[in-house]
A protein has these predicted regions:
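Bacterial Sec-dependent N-terminal signal peptides
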Residues: 1-15, 19
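Extracytoplasmic
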Residues: 35-37, 89, 107, 119
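Aromatic- and glycine-rich peptidoglycan recognition patches
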Residues: 16-20, 82, 106-172
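N-terminal hydrophobic or amphipathic helices/low-complexity stretches enriched
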Residues: 13-32
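Catalytic cysteine-centered active-site loop
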Residues: 16-19, 38-90, 100-101
């Protein structure tokens, strides 16, 4: 009798997860909170120099052995899109239009820190041009009118279970 063990990891094309990352949404948020007050710097993803929005999210996820694309638009994963904000979990990425509220293009990204499951209101941590790394509520007028969508990078955004699932098959 031979036992075969296989591991399945999400196959999102632009997200590369470490072999056995056990990161949770709480881990992501905890790491992100360590950088509150870090200044905004366009094109930078270094905690000693500053962050822009996508540099911040890619840096935080990289600390959990998960590589994200460097742009906010590139970080959006259509296959894991969350259309109902009440379904958001800690660690999910939220996307907004850029400075022009008329644009339909993604221009800003943040990480969900808290969600009201009844109303869909959420707070998120992000690198703001004016405040650096900060926490903002989704109800703030500037962001409320620019919200586009969200996506889940971690399969266990709020849970403590690892995102890999071992499967066993007995071959006789």
């Amino acid at each position: 009798m031979v036992m075969v063990i296989s591991v399945f990891v999400s196959n999102a094309q632009t997200v590369i997860k470490g072999d056995i990352s056990t990161a949770t949404g709480k881990d992501i948020v905890s790491e992100a909170m360590e950088h509150i007050g870090t200044p905004y710097r366009y094109g930078v993803s270094n905690p000693n120099r500053g962050f822009d929005c996508s540099g911040f999210t890619s840096y935080i996820y990289k600390q959990m052995d998960i590589s994200l694309p460097r742009s906010s638009k590139g970080q959006f994963q259509k296959e894991t899109e969350i259309t109902d904000p009440r379904q958001l979990k800690k660690g999910d990425l939220v996307f907004f239009k850029g400075r022009s509220s008329r644009s339909r293009n993604i221009g800003h990204v943040g990480i969900v820190t808290n969600v009201n499951k009844e109303t869909g209101e959420f707070s998120f941590i992000h690198a703001s041009c004016s405040k650096g790394v900060t926490i903002t509520k989704s109800t703030e007028k500037y962001y409320a009118k620019r919200y586009i969508s969200a996506c889940r990078i971690l399969e266990n955004s709020e849970d403590v279970e690892p995102f890999w699932i071992p499967t066993f098959k007995i071959i006789e």
